[in-house]
Amino acid sequence: MAKQKVRIRLKAYDHKILDQSARQIVEAAERTGALVAGPVPLPTKIERYSVIRSGFIDKDSQEQFEIRTHKRLIDVLDPSQQTINALMKLNLPAGVDIEIKL
């Protein structure tokens, strides 16, 4: 018989908030007796943009900006209904994108 698992994928621009959210999820799942694998750090996506500083001339003068998207993966193995309810009631900070797959 195949075991059921819940895969939780977290994304955020700030790694401190992301790690705090991952810790809250792991603690909530472990309190209800579920096995937890993770948080596993996934590769950080870096988007870089170059913008010309002046509006008309001076192509050599550019500014570089980057956005870093940090990701974590948490697997909750063999969750009970109590585990799922505890995860749904969690109040996570703004700025953390959560994707849950059953």
Swiss-Prot record:
A single Pfam family it belongs to is: Ribosomal_S10
Keywords for this protein: Ribonucleoprotein, Ribosomal protein
**Gene Ontology biological process terms in this record:** translation
Q: Which GO terms describe its molecular function?
A: structural constituent of ribosome; tRNA binding
Kindly list the residue ranges recorded as spanning the membrane: none
HAMAP family this protein is in?
Ribosomal_uS10
| Protein purpose | Involved in the binding of tRNA to the ribosomes.
Q: Which family does it belong to?
A: Belongs to the universal ribosomal protein uS10 family.
Record's subunit section = Part of the 30S ribosomal subunit.
**What's the name of the protein?**
Small ribosomal subunit protein uS10
